[in-house]
Amino acid sequence: MKLNLGCANVLLPDFVNVDVGPPADMIADLTLPWPWPASSVEYAMAHDIIEHLPDRIHTMNELWRVLVPGGKVEIIVPSASKGAGFAQDPTHKSQWCMNSFQYYQAGSFAVGRRAANYGITARFNIVEGPTETPYMDAY
């Protein structure tokens, strides 16, 4: 299964397009336990969605739980280090920057030292990035 999380109006073929309301294929509240079984998702696309979810640990743990071993997730967020991208939108509930993902990376300093204390179960391998989404102006 492939998930397009926070799809809004972008319905992709061959994906389960997920959002909090229509026109999504599946309506789901991602602040709750996710409705997919463990190890059932091969690929998840999360473009401009996870910053709208209040609990970063819950979000990353659920992504990890639903992915099959070797599954992939592609995440794009506005970086808090850039300021306006995150701060201007009142619907953003969590801040992310490039280093945020280290806390969910297998073998990282953050996972080794504190993961269990905070309930972090996700153990991703970052295979590309993180990179910052560029801010561009059209002239």
Where are the regions that the model predicts?
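S-adenosyl-L-methionine-dependent methyltransferase catalytic module, highlighting the catalytic core
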Residues: 54-64, 68, 72-139
